[in-house]
């Protein structure tokens, strides 16, 4: 079992190389049509499995197609990582669609809408805020 520092270092190297491969290595149009970015890489302590979280900009169908493209490109990506990182055993890649960015934008939109409604109502007469 690898130590924490090694696991973190391997995750960092995988993230860097995966970012490069997504831009220059993957030729699958499903992946290239949406804007795909890696948000997080988590490597298991035994260095056998790697969870790659990706954020995908585009419509729902484009996001689904990009995820399908990433899953089909996983063996190619793993092989490229093996060549580039020179590891004895390259972790198996599992892709996860990270919807946190889209949810964050949605929350910010709701907060803006609430602020607009509050400004339309004007100040509360007694000086205290409503709950």
Curated annotation (Swiss-Prot):
It comes from the Bacteria. Keywords: Cytoplasm, Ribosome biogenesis. The keyword RNA-binding does not apply. Its main location: cytoplasm. Pfam families: RBFA. SUPFAM superfamilies: Ribosome-binding factor A, RbfA. InterPro entries: KH_dom-like_a/b, RbfA, RbfA_dom_sf, Ribosome-bd_factorA_CS. It is found in: Cytoplasm. One of its GO terms (molecular function) is ribosomal small subunit binding. One of its GO terms (biological process) is maturation of SSU-rRNA. One of its GO terms (cellular component) is cytosol. Monomer. Binds 30S ribosomal subunits, but not 50S ribosomal subunits or 70S ribosomes. NCBIfam families: rbfA. Belongs to the RbfA family. One of several proteins that assist in the late maturation steps of the functional core of the 30S ribosomal subunit. Associates with free 30S ribosomal subunits (but not with 30S subunits that are part of 70S ribosomes or polysomes). Required for efficient processing of 16S rRNA. May interact with the 5'-terminal helix region of 16S rRNA. This is Ribosome-binding factor A.
């Amino acid at each position: 079992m690898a130590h924490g520092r090694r696991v973190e270092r391997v995750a960092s190297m995988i993230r860097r190389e995966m970012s490069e491969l997504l831009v220059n290595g993957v030729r699958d149009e499903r992946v290239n049509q949406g804007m795909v970015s890696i948000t997080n890489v988590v490597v298991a302590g035994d260095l056998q499995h790697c969870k790659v979280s990706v954020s995908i900009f585009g419509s729902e169908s484009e996001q689904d197609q990009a995820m399908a493209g990433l899953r089909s490109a996983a063996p190619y990506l793993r092989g490229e990582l093996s060549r580039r990182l020179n590891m004895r055993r390259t972790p198996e890649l599992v892709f996860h669609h990270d919807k946190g960015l889209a949810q964050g934008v949605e929350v910010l939109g709701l907060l803006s809408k609430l602020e607009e409604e509050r400004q339309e109502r004007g100040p509360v007469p007694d000086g205290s805020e409503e709950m």
